[in-house]
């Protein structure tokens, strides 16, 4: 009887061991596949929510541009200095992103990168101005008074604007107004 209990115990523990090993192998394969998928996906999603293009009822944007509320946005995948970014946008008949309201902040909220925006300090006006000369609205970035006037402004996914050296390289967003 003791031999039977020992044999039965070995059979049960062996079966459970094989099941555990199978589960661990399956878990390892699933984790490997999910990490591979996560590392590949960001390369194909450069920034803000591309679904916004479907909501654009009054504009037709060129290829690689995203439409949202009668504006087209180019979301760069390469990093440039602020001046290089500004010139590249101008060559596309657009300008660095100028945020008009919190809706555009929502448009940016799905991004996980830093982007140059078209905000710089005007020594002549002693104020932060958008590329078109309009003043920065204080409700967009409540802490804007702490920015260093010698720096340029990058936007981050948490809804904050940060001042960085204009020679640093960041991704950028160009905005083209259609109306």
UniProtKB/Swiss-Prot annotation:
Residues in the Cytoplasmic compartment per record: 1-10
Domain of life: Eukaryota
Glycosylation sites: 83, 132
Keyword Glycoprotein: yes
Record's keyword terms, sorted: Adaptive immunity, Cell membrane, Disulfide bond, Glycoprotein, Immunity, Innate immunity, Lectin, Membrane, Receptor, Signal-anchor, Transmembrane, Transmembrane helix
Residue intervals on the Extracellular side: 32-179
Subcellular location: Cell membrane
Known tissue expression: Natural killer cells.
Domain spans labelled C-type lectin: 68-175
A GO molecular-function annotation: protein antigen binding
Membrane topology summary: Single-pass type II membrane protein
One GO-annotated biological process of the protein: stimulatory C-type lectin receptor signaling pathway
Xref: InterPro entries: C-type_lectin-like, C-type_lectin-like/link_sf, CTDL_fold, NKG2/CD94_NK_receptors, NKR-like_CTLD
GO cellular component: external side of plasma membrane; plasma membrane; receptor complex
Bilayer-spanning residue ranges: 11-31
Cysteine pairings via disulfide bonds: 58-70, 61-72, 89-174, 152-166
Listed CDD domains: CLECT_NK_receptors_like
Function field: Immune receptor involved in self-nonself discrimination. In complex with KLRC1 or KLRC2 on cytotoxic and regulatory lymphocyte subsets, recognizes non-classical major histocompatibility (MHC) class Ib molecule MHC-E loaded with self-peptides derived from the signal sequence of classical MHC class Ia and non-classical MHC class Ib molecules. Enables cytotoxic cells to monitor the expression of MHC class I molecules in healthy cells and to tolerate self. Primarily functions as a ligand binding subunit as it lacks the capacity to signal. KLRD1-KLRC1 acts as an immune inhibitory receptor. Key inhibitory receptor on natural killer (NK) cells that regulates their activation and effector functions. Dominantly counteracts T cell receptor signaling on a subset of memory/effector CD8-positive T cells as part of an antigen-driven response to avoid autoimmunity. On intraepithelial CD8-positive gamma-delta regulatory T cells triggers TGFB1 secretion, which in turn limits the cytotoxic programming of intraepithelial CD8-positive alpha-beta T cells, distinguishing harmless from pathogenic antigens.
Subunit structure: Can form disulfide-bonded heterodimer with NKG2 family members KLRC1 and KLRC2. KLRD1-KLRC1 heterodimer interacts with peptide-bound MHC-E-B2M heterotrimeric complex. KLRD1 plays a prominent role in directly interacting with MHC-E. KLRD1-KLRC1 interacts with much higher affinity with peptide-bound MHC-E-B2M than KLRD1-KLRC2. Interacts with the adapter protein TYROBP/DAP12; this interaction is required for cell surface expression and cell activation.
Protein name listed in UniProt: Natural killer cells antigen CD94
Taxonomic lineage: Eukaryota, Metazoa, Chordata, Craniata, Vertebrata
